[in-house]
Each structure stands twice: as structure tokens, then as C-alpha cells.
Amino acid sequence: MAGSADISKGCSGQLFAELHSLSHYSFLRSAASPEELVRRADDLGYAAIAITDECSVAGIVKAYQESKARDIKLVVGSEFRVPEVGTLVVLAPTREAYAELCKKITLFRSRSEKGHYQANIDDFFDGFSQCLLLWQPDFSQAQLLAIGEKLKSVWQQRFWLLYERHYQADDERAFQAMVELQQAVKVKVTCAGGVCMATIEQQPLYDILNAIQHGGSLAHQPGLASNNAEHHLRSLSELQQCYPQKWLAETLVIAQQCQFCLSELRYEYPAELVPEGMSASGYLKQLTEQGARWRYPQGVPESIKALYLKELSLIKEQSYEPFFLTIHDLVRFAREQGILFQGRGSAANSVVCYCLGITAVNPAQIQVLFERFISKERNEPPDIDVDFEHERREEVIQYIYRKYGRQRAALAATVITYRFKSAFRDVGKALGFSEQQLQYFRRNLDRRDKEQSWQQQLVQQHPEVTNSVRGQHLLQFTEQLMGTPRHLSQHVGGFVIAADDLSRLVPVENASMTDRTVIQWDKTDLESLGLLKVDVLALGMLTALRKMLALINLRYDQQLTMATIPQEDSRVYQQLQTADSMGIFQIESRAQMNMLPRLKPKTFYDLVIQIAIVRPGPIQGDMVHPFLRRRAGLEEVDYPSDEVKSVLERTLGVPIFQEQVIKLAMVAAGFSGGEADQLRRAMASWGQNGHLTRFEDKLINGMLERGYKQEFAERLFRQICGFGQYGFPESHSASFANLAYVSSWFKTYHPAAFYVGLLNSLPMGFYSASQLVQDAQRHGVAFLAADINASDWNYCWLPKEDTNSDETVRMGLRQIQGLSESRIKHTLMQRPEDGFTSMHELRKSGLRDSDINALARADALKSIAGHRHQAHWQSLSMSDQQMPLFENVKDRPARQLPAPDEPDNIKADYESTGLTLGRHPLALLRNNPELKNCVLASDLMTCRSGQVLTLAGLVTCRQRPGTRSGVTFLTLEDESGNSNVVVWANTARQFRQCFLTSNLLWVKGIVEIHDGVVHVIAGRLKDLSGLLSFTRLESRRFH
């Protein structure tokens, strides 16, 4: 065990334990990861290493995992920099000491905003009865003797002075001061490296990080660069030259006392949900049986009963009942509050979850693999993801805090790491480049180019920069910085709930959002230690669906729910087969739209396959085309055995889901459940470490031993490799398919309600409000402009008697940019029945100038002041009437201004609302010579395959799948609809600038028609964005 490794382990007779080292979880203060520090310490022959990040234990779990692999002792601690005192390093020798440390870190963090802490010397005179303290004094300060004596009186034998030597100019003075302080206080001295680097080679990156931290540049502030690299882990011989032997030996004494290991942590889940007099297992069984009767009102099938009894037995054996009861309590609360939710992921493999109402997919609809959810051999906590409406998830989060208290519940952390854009920017600034220069360099870089790295592109485009030393450093350090932690953020919804004070287990700190707290460990850390978390996630489509249901139920006096929407409706599938899926959850991407006419879903299970098959795994594993050929009857389905047939029959002999791969390994190659799960994990990390190769022999030999042919065994392994980290679980796909079907049903039968629900739930999903409104118009939905006297805050589905149409929608004021929601809603509450009649009356409602100006620019004051120019003029002329003296002054006589023309109106529409209800901008440009002979999107179906043509449109979507090297799918929008353009790597590279940045793109290419799907293969590209000078349109870069 790493926590109790043999302390006598040494190298060349010299023994040393590093007691003060920072990892890159002391954000921007270290160039080394925890793993690198542990590995290097072991290589150097250290007896132990302490990871002592600043007011944090964020790196210790990763260090612990590495220390177990290396069999080097890990000491847990933390560093605190205290003004006018120096640096205090606190070490945890025992489990109780570790709890003390975590509680103190929590206290210090609670005093400050996210990312900071406050600690003073008085904090170290109380509350530490078990920890060890190393004090590195700031010898520039006074009163050190008094502080030292007070620390000794409190900490007694648990207190040392800490000396670190880094070959600075004042080393001798500091050494003498340390000796004098030791003699005065009569306390022992130990030594450490103050480590911020694993190796000397990390010094240049360390200097870059230091410049970033201080917001300066090494070019203009040379003092930000370190004098040497002595903050790295030094060899034992180097350390022997630095420090007295007695001080070195003291490091071992201290390390010997530190016997705490993270394996000692025990996590207890809340148990208060169990009624008095009942056991957790008995109560969970009771709830499951009640739920089974609710799910199966005609009688619970024996097969279902057998499954849930088997699951309950394993849940009891693993003591997971409180976890399931907690999830059940959360969804019960959501259901009582009318909040839509749905469990997904591996939990959909569980019949218990289905009976408890956590998941919505009937296990009879999919092939259940409970081992994918809970496995005795895996001995890891289950993962239950529950999506809630994104607008109301906060209600669930605050319910958790109310029920368990902030001492017992907090969100898991997410480590925000440097990605290319942020690394390029911060490194560039640290090297002295200006923001304008960096934007210029980065402008035409295509990070998705699989044949040319971004470095090669930069060298090619800006040789004058990259030939310089500074330019070379920009290339080098940007690459090194990518992946380095930048700060902690909150997980999207992973809650850790404890039976007792959570801060005894892990420190808790403030999140950037009010009323949120976050622990210092991320999801991976929790999994490594076997700690349970509850995933309370947000999903915009659930918000939209709840609003659609409310609209239908109110309009038609129904009690429709997601569960009572008619199933297997042929009209729904007919619409999907035509790729009419804009706005439909999970099947609205261009790739999904291209697949729909080919796969032609006719049943719910077809939809499950549809969602899973358009993924990198099936595509890379060459599973898509065989499946489509077999589905179309063009290829014979052949199974090498009945066992394989039982696994693959529903997908025509092609493994599409992750569960199928696991089952195949078990039935065809003889894998145990635990071995099959190890295979799944290797698949998940294939792109990172290639661990799949170690299963190749076992998988292939296992199949050969069972009589399968070599060709089948090798093909299956290739397919597994193709899945890589992108294999999609059937349970996950089934949960998503349920939402996809429901949203498709609304689009088919109630398009106005469908689009109103979506528009009132933005921002979410794949498409902008402009694209959704245009799609709605193509489906017969009419839109009326926003008006202060007719609109509400949200889009409204208007009564048929008001419009003589059942599909008319009034734009909501929410669509107008720059409005205050609270002030507008206050004004709407005061709106007279007949509406406002003057600008003066409107102002008295409490709106500010900015609100009235925004309404005027959006042409939403037409009923009061006329066209937008007139209304805007009146709003400006009223600015001198805000003083009390002018409170009762009537509106001035309005100067009559000319009405805007059509281009002006379109431009103002886009600037104020992001969309127009007038003609499409391309309709106004259609007679421009640049667009001469361009084919309309609606006419592409009449073209023949192989025809050369030109087309033009607004770039609304750029997609580059991670599977098909070098290909990008563009969506171009004109006044008639959308067209699909395929741009291969060579074409993208040849026309890189317009390909990456164009808003209005002209394309010359060749038509390709396959299975009713039309593409244009681009040969030439031209940027026509200049023609859009009358609008403020922006293209969408990449999804």
C-alpha cells in the first residue's frame, strides 16, 4: 500500500522525503502534474513525496493512483501563504488529521470568492490538534520570534521550521536567520525543495506560467523569469550538497509519522430516507414493487419480476440502497413540482430504475444488460444520470441543499484545462505579443485539419514570425500548455451527498454562482475512490417539451403527458424519413439528417439505432454500410452461431451498441463479466492509450477455441477498435430516442406548439431562432411581429378565432436584444386592456431609456409611434423629460421621418432580434451578378447526379466529424431552404480563409444524389459576405 510503503527505501545510502511540492493544481504556480512529481520522486530514490498544493487537495487523488503503481509513499498536505508570516505547510499524519486539514481549507475558502482563500496566523493557533506543521518564515518581517514561540506552544512536537535553498543571493542570510530562529524557539529544522517542477526541463514553461499568473510578459518584465531551475526535484547528491545531514534526516522522521492513506476514506451515504422500523433494502424493495404495479397495470410479467429481484439482490450486496433511494426522492420531488425529467445512460439497463420512475424506457424495448450498470466484479458505484428541465434544474439543486444542508452536499468539480485558443492567447501575451497580433495569427488556423497541424499552418502562413525565437517559443509552449489545469469549475450536475460533514472527506469551496458550493475533486477522482455522486443534469429539450405539453393541454383541455403520447405513429416516422428533423432532439444534425432517408426508421427501435449509428464508433468500425445494405435486403445476414445471433439479431448481425460488444466478448470469447467490463473501459480510453491491444489475443483466441473462424474473430476486433471512445450504449440511445420520438410527434401534429416551445426555451439545441422561425414558416406556421401592445415576453400561440388560423404565432419580446426581462414583465402587468396609447404612458410603466430604444429599434412600438425610425426618434426626444419637472409633459409633436426601405428594415431586424419576418436577405440579392445562375436550394432535388452547378447561401452550420478525415459538411441557407455542401480537405485548404470565415458563401461543385439525399461536392469557394453589408449576419463556425 502506497500509504505505508517502506520508509527505509533509499538510494546510494542517502534517504530523503520531499515534504513541500506543488502540482499544477496550484493553478499557474507549478509546471508539473501530480503524476509527474510522483514518478520523478520514485526515479530519484526518494523515500516519500508530499503533494502540498496551495489551500487545496485537488491533486492528491491522481498522485495517490500513481503512488500505488510506483509503490512510493505519498504524504498528503497543503501549503498556505500567510501575509507577514511566510509559508505554512500542513501535513496529515492520520485520518483525523486529514479531516482537520479539509475543514480548515473549507473555512479559508469560504471567506473568499471562487478561486481564492483567506488565512491569517491566528487560524493556525486553533483547530489543528492532529496535523503536523512546517513553517518557512518570511525573514523580511518582524515579530517572527513571537510567532514562532506561539506556534510551538500550540503545536508542540508537531512543529518544525522549514528551510529551502534555491541558490539565491540571500541564501546565506536566510540560513543564518533560520539557525538563529531555531536556537531562539528551540524547535527542530527540516528541509524541502519548494518544488514547482518535476525536471529541470520544465523551467521555461514554469516561467511562462509565472508571467501568465502576474499578467505580464517576459519580454517587458524580465523579473518574471526565474533565476534558475532549482525548484525542480533534485537528485539525492544535489540535496546532500544543499542541506545539513541532520535536516535531511528529519524529513524521514516526519514522513514516518505520516501514515494516512486515501484508502482509509470511508464514504457513508445518507440514510434518513428510510422510514423508521424498515431497512433500506426492505424499503427499496417495497418502492420497486409499487412502481412495478404502476408501470405494468395489467400485471407484472414474471420476467420483469425476476429481473428486479436479481437487481435488488446485487444492490443489497453492494449496499447501494441509499443511493437509489436518494435518486428516487429527487425524481419524486420533481414530479410533484411538475418538472420534467428523464434518467438515461447505463441506468436505463436497470429494471429497478424503470420501476422507480427514474428512467422512461421500458426494458422490454431494449436488450437489458444490468452488468453495464452494476457489476459485482467491478465493485464500483452505479452511475445514474437524470436530466431535468434546464430552466428548472436549480429548483432540484436547491432542494438537495435544503434537505441535506450545505455541510453535507456539494457539487463535484470539473477541471478546466487550457485548450488551444486560451493557451495560444496566454502564451502569446506572456511572450510579449499583442492581442491584435495573436488574433491575426490565429484567424485562418484550422484546428480540424487532420493533415496539417496548426503549427505547420502557422509556419506556412506567417514564416516571418515563426522563424524568430519568440515565434518558436509560441509554438512550443502553446503545445505544452494545452491540457494543463487552469482552474476548478463546477461539474454540470454531479452532487456528492454525505451522511455527515462533507468537509471531513474533501474540502468544499464557493462556486462562481451564488448558492452553489463545490468540492475539490472531479468525477475521475470520485470514481477512483469509489465515492458516489448524484448527477442532476440539465436538458433544454425537456424544458421545451414541458412547454409544448402545457400549450396543447391548455388549448384543447387535455391531460397529455409524455407517457400518453401515441406510440409508433406512422405519420411521425414518415416525416422523419424525409429528414424533416430540424429542432428534433438528437436527430437534427446534418449527419443525422443525411442518415434518416437511408435508414428510414419505422419503429421506436429503429430510432434507437438511428441515434447510435451516426456516431464515430460504428462509422470507424465499418458497421454503417453493412447494416444499411442488410436492412435494404441487398446483403444476406449470416450468424456464425446461435449465441452470436441472440446478441446481434436485432441489429442484423452488426454490432452497433456498446452492450452488444460486451455480450459478444462474453458469449463468443468466454470473457467473464468483469473482463468484459475491462474491455469496455479499454474501449473508452482507446484514443488515449491504446489499451485495447492487450485484449486482442484473448478475444481472438477465445473465439477460435469456441469454433469461430479467424476472419470473423479479426473482423469483430476491428469493429471493437472502431468503436474506440465513441461506442454508444443502447440504453443511452433508447433514452434519447424516447425524447426524439416525442418531439417528432409534436412537430408532426402540432407544429405551432412545437416551435413556440423551442423558441421559448432558447438558448439550447442546434439551431438559432432565425433558423427555427424559417423552418416553422416552411411548415405553415405564420408569425406576427413583436409589439409592445400585443406581445408577451414569450412567443405566443394565438387563438384561432383571433387569426382565422390554427398555426399563428406572435413573436415574444424576449427575442429583442438588450431588454430587461424583469422591467418588461413589470410593464406588461401594467399594460391597459386597450394597450399603451403614447410613449409618455409607456415610460410611466417604469421602462428605462435603454428598453424603450431597444423596442423602437425592433419596430415593436409601431402601434404607439409608427415605424421604427419614427419610434426611435421619439424615444430619443424624450430623454430630457426624465426629471420630475417634466413628469407630466405630454409627448412632443413628432417630426415625420421617412419610413425605412426593405433593406434597412431587414438590417434593423437582424440587429435587434437576430432574425427577420420579412424576405430572406438572399431574395434581395438574387439579381446581383455574383449570384447569377446560382441554383436555389429547393431546386436541387430536380438536378441530376453528376451535374456541375453553382449555389450560394448563408453559412448556418459547419460540421467536421471526428471520423471522416478531412471532410466538412456545410449547411447553406437561401430563401427557399437549406442545401448540403461537402468540402474535402484539399478544397478547404485551397480556399481556407473563405471556408473558415465566410458568412455568405458561393460554391461551385458537383451534385451527388444517394438514397434521396442530395449533396454538392464543392470544387471552388468564394466569399460573398461583402454583399451582406445591409445586415449583421454571422456564420456559425463549427458544431
Swiss-Prot record:
One of its GO terms (biological process) is DNA replication. Keywords: Cytoplasm, DNA damage, DNA repair, DNA replication, DNA-directed DNA polymerase, Nucleotidyltransferase, Transferase. One of its GO terms (molecular function) is 3'-5' exonuclease activity. GO terms for cellular component: cytoplasm. InterPro entries: DNA_pol3_alpha_NTPase_dom, DNA_pol3_finger, DnaE2, DnaE2/DnaE/PolC, DNAPol_HHH, NA-bd_OB_tRNA, PHP_dom, Pol/His_phosphatase_N. It is found in: Cytoplasm. It catalyses: DNA(n) + a 2'-deoxyribonucleoside 5'-triphosphate = DNA(n+1) + diphosphate. Its EC number is 2.7.7.7. Its main location: cytoplasm. It is an enzyme of class 2 (transferase). SUPFAM superfamilies: PHP domain-like. PANTHER family: DNA POLYMERASE III SUBUNIT ALPHA (PTHR32294), ERROR-PRONE DNA POLYMERASE (PTHR32294:SF4). DNA polymerase involved in damage-induced mutagenesis and translesion synthesis (TLS). It is not the major replicative DNA polymerase. HAMAP family: DNApol_error_prone. Belongs to the DNA polymerase type-C family. DnaE2 subfamily. This is Error-prone DNA polymerase. It comes from Idiomarina loihiensis (strain ATCC BAA-735 / DSM 15497 / L2-TR). The gene is dnaE2.
